[in-house]
Curated annotation (Swiss-Prot):
E.C. number: 2.7.1.130
Gene: lpxK
Entry protein name: Tetraacyldisaccharide 4'-kinase
Family: Belongs to the LpxK family.
Record organism: Paraburkholderia xenovorans (strain LB400)
Enzyme class: transferase
Pathway membership: Glycolipid biosynthesis; lipid IV(A) biosynthesis; lipid IV(A) from (3R)-3-hydroxytetradecanoyl-[acyl-carrier-protein] and UDP-N-acetyl-alpha-D-glucosamine: step 6/6
Pfam families on file: LpxK
Keyword Calcium: no
GO BP: any one term: lipid A biosynthetic process
Residues at which ATP binds: T65, V66, G67, G68, T69, G70, K71, T72
InterPro entries, A to Z: LpxK, P-loop_NTPase
Catalytic activity: a lipid A disaccharide + ATP = a lipid IVA + ADP + H(+)
């Protein structure tokens, strides 16, 4: 079933990169989607629907396209940058696939099934307070009440969650940018490319030039040394796997980006794309004839109680442009209480 789902997703992703017959056939539905989205934005803008400002500045890191673009590494890097600037950041998230319906704190010891894989990874990587809830306002209010030291909140995704007032909006794109430029379902866009934002980050290592949008910055993602799943203290540079029979597996929004990263490091892995947010309740690699299995950090936090000594985890670090950090810090300081 997952193989069929992967094929359908791949087909749709290809269609969204061009203005073919299927895309044009779906444009009436895209017009309806766009009208509903615009009406909702207007309702919040004019105060017909109430938005809520929490007691600290809010920075939203999101996207206007469907699929993974590199938001989670960006959130992790931004939390660290805000710390360096003297802030005490916290993080809120919806928690994709989470079981929780009320504000819940995610700690490094939490299960991915409780709050989702991305919040758990952020908690483990940053040590910052992380709260999840389908209602991001409730999550932010609970975070502020429980952690009085927090003086800025980073929202992992939630660009379209207008009920939570925000002070900075960062939009992340990968190499696909806006695809064919059509709204869902004719294209990959949740909102028009012209949507207002404070800055744009482009996650494309092969881009020679950036779009001529205001405050647009390159987002650099680089893999670190792999660590062994059973013994995280055991680390190896990716180049050391070049003589192994390697399988690269990823259950993320853009698995091909992970595979390309490994190829750029000199590896020639077999690949297996799993559905985004794949649960890993059982070992999906029992049929794999490989010396080494490389997975993402986001997938590693979801692995159950089963054991496979071949698995190594590849972390990814995001490098933020210093000008972007300065822009965010300036806006946050401008909103912070004196």
């Amino acid at each position: 079933m997952s193989e069929i789902s992967n094929r359908l997703e791949a087909r749709l992703a290809r269609e969204w990169q061009q203005r073919g017959p299927l895309a044009w056939a779906l444009t009436p539905f895209a017009c309806v989607f766009g009208a509903i989205a615009a009406a909702r934005r207007a309702a919040f803008s004019f105060g017909w629907l109430k938005s809520v400002r929490v007691g600290v500045p809010v920075v939203v890191v999101g996207n206007v396209t469907v699929g993974g673009t590199g938001k989670t590494p960006t959130v992790i890097a931004l939390v660290e940058a805000l710390r360096v600037a003297g802030f005490n950041p916290g993080v809120v998230s919806r928690g994709y696939g989470a079981r929780v319906t009320t504000p819940t704190q995610i700690t490094p010891a939490s299960a991915a099934s409780v709050g989702g894989d991305e919040p758990l990874l952020i908690s483990r990587r940053t040590g910052a307070p992380v709260w999840v809830c389908p209602d991001r306002v409730a999550a932010a209010q609970a975070l502020c009440a429980a952690h009085r030291e927090v003086d800025v909140i980073v929202s992992d995704d939630g660009l379209q969650h207008y009920r939570l007032q925000r002070d900075v909006e960062l939009v992340v794109f990968d190499h696909r940018l806006g695809g064919n430029g059509f709204l869902l379902p004719a294209g990959p866009l949740r909102e028009p490319l012209s949507r207002r934002r404070d800055a744009t980050l482009i996650n494309d290592p092969y881009a020679r030039t950036l779009p001529a949008w205001p405050n647009t910055f390159a987002l650099q993602l680089a893999p670190g040394d792999a660590w062994h799943l059973d013994n995280p203290a055991l680390r190896r540079p990716l180049a050391q796997f070049s003589g192994d029979r390697v399988l690269a597996a990823a259950g993320i929004g853009a698995p091909e980006r992970f595979f390309a990263t490994l190829r750029a490091a000199g590896l020639t892995p077999a690949t297996r794309a799993l559905p985004d947010h794949y649960a890993f309740e059982r070992n999906p690699f029992t049929d794999v004839d490989a010396d080494t299995i490389l997975i993402t950090e986001k997938d590693a936090v979801k692995l159950g109680s089963w054991h496979d000594a071949r698995i190594w985890v590849v972390p990814v670090e995001a490098a933020l442009d210093h000008r972007l950090i300065a822009l965010v810090v300036e806006k946050v300081r401008g909103r912070s209480p004196a």
